[in-house]
Amino acid sequence: MDRAPVTTGPLDMPIMHDSDRYDFVKDIGSGNFGVARLMRDKLTKELVAVKYIERGDKIDENVQREIINHRSLRHPNIVRFKEVILTPTHLAIIMEYASGGELYERICNAGRFSEDEARFFFQQLLSGVSYCHSMQICHRDLKLENTLLDGSPAPRLKICDFGYSKSSVLHSQPKSTVGTPAYIAPEVLLRQEYDGKIADVWSCGVTLYVMLVGAYPFEDPEEPRDYRKTIQRILSVKYSIPDDIRISPECCHLISRIFVADPATRISIPEIKTHSWFLKNLPADLMNESNTGSQFQEPEQPMQSLDTIMQIISEATIPAVRNRCLDDFMTDNLDLDDDMDDFDSESEIDIDSSGEIVYAL
């Protein structure tokens, strides 16, 4: 499974002032959003992940949506939002640190999972997504790279990256096409108004398939980077399970109920949670989820108020004076993947270097 290259390394950019509460530990990633760093709380010694986004034009409605939606979610299977801080050059989003890394990397190292291990992570994924939906938030970009793991022996899955999420309370019904081609539901590709919750189910199904098979269900094995072909196969729901992969009939049935082109007849999350394959070996803490969110509160650290966050975001839209070295770094990391140079520039579809697809509506 291919993914876009990520550049990491020492970054010449301000961390935070010495008087602030976090100390720099190391760089942990970068992307089109900016950079991510591991920091340590000076008071509690807790490790946190900090996502830095350049002040100015990059602080758009997607960033605001990510922060506001993420702030409202408190669940064991969702990376915990802590606060936002304004630095001289960046908006810093402080989050829980998931020391186990990406589920994507775990699958790459293993090749594929056993059915029991895939079910273990799928149950947690469904728990987190179900909670999001109960809070009237659809994620819209569920994928392996957006599912992290904590460092425990039986890893707890953590959903992250709410940049494409949409709230039915705060926002209109989704209509734009966002996400990564391999995970996108057919109705989303058709650019019609759609139910983001049902589209999330499709993406969960892709994640389950990849855990079981070690490959994406709708990619052409001969031409995995041919996104047009991937899209065609999604629209026609053309997938198969390799003959050498042993999967139980119950699991195959669940996958066949998820990969349904018509969202009206696709299985829903409440229905998945009553499916015999899902219920097998279901952890006790996932059986009764009525108080899952409330038990995750942190009384010693009050949640940053919405007014404070909105004020910080507003200030972050004002560009800061920058040094040339940082400008060079950020520009270098926004170069498009050479593999996409020959893609039809006249196409209505915009696919970026990571394989993400966006229709601007």
Swiss-Prot record:
It holds the Pfam family Pkinase. Expressed at low levels in seeds, seedlings, roots (especially in tips), stems, leaves, shoots, flowers and siliques. Activated by autophosphorylation of its activation loop. Autophosphorylated in vitro. This is Serine/threonine-protein kinase SRK2I. PROSITE patterns: PROTEIN_KINASE_ATP (PS00107), PROTEIN_KINASE_DOM (PS50011), PROTEIN_KINASE_ST (PS00108). One of its GO terms (cellular component) is nucleus. The gene is SRK2I. Belongs to the protein kinase superfamily. Ser/Thr protein kinase family. Keywords: Abscisic acid signaling pathway, ATP-binding, Kinase, Nucleotide-binding, Serine/threonine-protein kinase, Transferase. SMART domains: S_TKc. It catalyses: L-seryl-[protein] + ATP = O-phospho-L-seryl-[protein] + ADP + H(+); L-threonyl-[protein] + ATP = O-phospho-L-threonyl-[protein] + ADP + H(+). Residues 22-278 form the Protein kinase domain. Induction: By abscisic acid (ABA), salt, and osmotic stress (at protein level). Interacts with ABI1. Interacts with FREE1 (via C-terminus). The active site is at D141 (proton acceptor). InterPro entries: Kinase-like_dom_sf, Prot_kinase_dom, Protein_kinase_ATP_BS, Ser/Thr_kinase_AS. It comes from Arabidopsis thaliana. The keyword Signal does not apply. GO terms for molecular function: ATP binding; kinase activity; protein kinase activity; protein serine kinase activity; protein serine/threonine kinase activity. One of its GO terms (biological process) is regulation of seed germination. It comes from the Eukaryota. Its EC number is 2.7.11.1.
